[in-house]
């Protein structure tokens, strides 16, 4: 008869990775939704609105979204022209979908809106309408509904947990700004166009990642309060 192995001497198996711990049903606005990404200089001060790109998409909850890109040109430093184009397009969407919430991931977008509105101005009533419509997915959605075993400060890990497949490597805000600065230093229009296309693609990916997290929360979250 063979001896039983000593449990104390057995080699430990792989530790189980903790999963999501749901705290409450996700409290998310109804469709339609406008997904929003604003990219600016991550090292800028509160009034340094070095906005170089915007990504947005109207989502009715059914069909696939069509990301829109508003990117900087190279004629003027700072973000005035990007901001003016964004305000024009956002005004059209606010008029057409007055009840839609504008979903962004972290507090960065609200800070950019406030800084650019202060620096460059807005049409009467625009700032109040947009600020009222903003909905931060991280603080008002993710952190109120679920505890995750990862860093939630950026969307990358959260979206991956939700099943979204990212490109590799991710550009990130610092990478996008670095590419834009290199393009500003270049006189080659082909290089500049390529950089702006890369930035627009990265913003579109962020929009789709937010959508994936949103749908994951709706599908996987509890219907009743937990605990």
Please report, for each region that a protein language model flagged, where it lies by residue.
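Acidic active-site catalytic centers that drive phospho-/nucleotidyl reactions
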Residues: 37, 137, 206
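Acidic, Mg2+-coordinating catalytic module of metal-dependent nucleases/exonucleases
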Residues: 158-227
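Conserved DEDDh/DEDDy metal-dependent 3′-5′ exonuclease domain
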Residues: 66-177
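Generic beta-strand/beta-sheet core signal
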Residues: 36, 57-59, 103-106, 202, ...
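Metal-dependent catalytic core segments for phosphate chemistry
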Residues: 26-33, 38-85
